């Protein structure tokens, strides 16, 4: 059991849990990073899924938070997400429908920080 900001959560060491944040819009990416860092996570930013999931940062990531605009080729999304091999929280625009991606939990934009932090905690804990 590990404490994160005074909370105990499963067997995951949240103090060292890296979250890969993928968003092409720098301001949005930094906003997501700020919310997650305030929840005690370490964050690594990338602009697009194709580069993020093959980067050295992907090896140390506990999960990824991906803006739907960061997916250049939706036809390859399942292959990319499967190759990442870790849980993904997919931030979806209200009007976009995503293909069925078993490793992805959907969170509709816009959202507040707390639902995102809870989603990250839940997907990381689900890996154990």
Task: Please report, for each region that a protein language model flagged, where it lies by residue.
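Alpha4 helix (beta4-alpha4-beta5 surface) of REC/receiver domains from two-component response regulators
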Residues: 76, 90-109, 118
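Acidic, metal-coordinating helix/loop segments flanking the phosphotransfer/catalytic sites
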Residues: 46-63, 71
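Non-catalytic signal-transmission and effector/linker regions of two-component phosphorelay proteins
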Residues: 1-39, 50-53, 112-128
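Residue-level detector of anion-binding/catalytic polar loops
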Residues: 42, 87
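Short, structured coil segments at secondary-structure junctions
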Residues: 39, 84, 101-102
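Conserved phosphotransfer microenvironments
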Residues: 29, 60-85, 93-95
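A structural preference for short, hydrophobic beta-strand core positions in alpha/beta folds
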Residues: 45-46, 90
């Amino acid at each position: 059991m590990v404490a994160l900001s005074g909370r105990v959560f499963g067997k995951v060491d949240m103090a060292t849990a890296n979250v890969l944040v993928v968003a092409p819009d720098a301001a949005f990416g930094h906003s997501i990073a700020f919310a997650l860092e305030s929840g005690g996570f370490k964050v690594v930013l990338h602009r697009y899924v194709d580069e993020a999931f093959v980067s050295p940062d992907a090896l140390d990531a506990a999960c990824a938070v991906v803006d739907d605009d960061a997916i250049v080729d939706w036809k390859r999304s399942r292959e990319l997400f499967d190759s990442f091999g870790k849980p993904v929280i997919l931030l979806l625009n209200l009007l976009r429908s995503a293909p069925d991606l078993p490793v992805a939990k959907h969170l509709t934009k816009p959202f507040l920080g707390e639902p995102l932090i809870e989603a990250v905690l839940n997907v990381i804990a689900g890996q154990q």
